[in-house]
Amino acid sequence: MSESLLIILGDGPTFASAIAIAKRAHPTSVLRTERLMPSDIANTTMDFLDECDPAMTSVFAAIGMHALNYARFDLWAKLRLRGMRIASLIDPSAHVDPTASIGENCLIESGVSIGPNATVAAGTIIQSGVGLSADAKIGKFSWIGMNSTVGAGAAVGSHVVLGAGVHIASGVTIGAHCEIVQPGLFAKSLNEGTFISPQFTEPARVYRVAAVSPASSSNLMWQGTP
């Protein structure tokens, strides 16, 4: 019988983190790594996947950090179109409640705690030391920075970036495409596209996504006040 094969595609810190977690979490699987820069995603054919047994192969799109949420989405979409089985990687030191739901192509790093009935949608990266309380929800292709927390019943939308040390209070809603890079407690809900940085004294730089192509992030268009 063939051994299971795990292929990790990507580059940068997320790529390195995914490889380390895969070695700890799946020591009996054959691990193959393929470096792929975000700028190469639109043109890559990934022909090497044709040589793999689909029944025994899982893949993980390990491209990340903040604005690269969209590049990770593009790579995931190409893998889905090829009919590949897509893995999630969870560090053995993380605690995931049995009632929690983790989507495909999620990376859960060391020391993470995910509470009862919490939901983490596809493509999301959760860095080390993050805590998600009961019934918390994280949308697709988001990035949750280290030592951040999301309170009970709080909802974080898709394509959101929470920087390190950001704490979302219970019951708060963070709209899609928000970026919060200022550490601290956020007890009020934020509209879609809100950007919060230490450079500003109040929420600023509101953007709205006009179009997102699953085939290429080059078709990503932003509208709003810079």
Where are these regions (language model features)?
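Terminal amphipathic alpha-helical/low-complexity segments used for targeting or macromolecular assembly
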Residues: M1-D91, Y207-P226
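Residue-level detector of alpha-helical recognition elements and their boundaries
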Residues: T33, M37, D74, G139-K140, ...
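Short secondary-structure capping/turn micro-motifs that flank functional sites
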Residues: P38-S39, H95-V96, T194
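A generic local structural motif
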Residues: T45-F48, F73-D74, A94, V130, ...
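Extended, small-residue-rich solenoid/repeat segments and analogous flexible loops
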Residues: D50-G131, A136, F141
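Glycine-rich hexapeptide-repeat left-handed beta-helix
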Residues: G145-P226
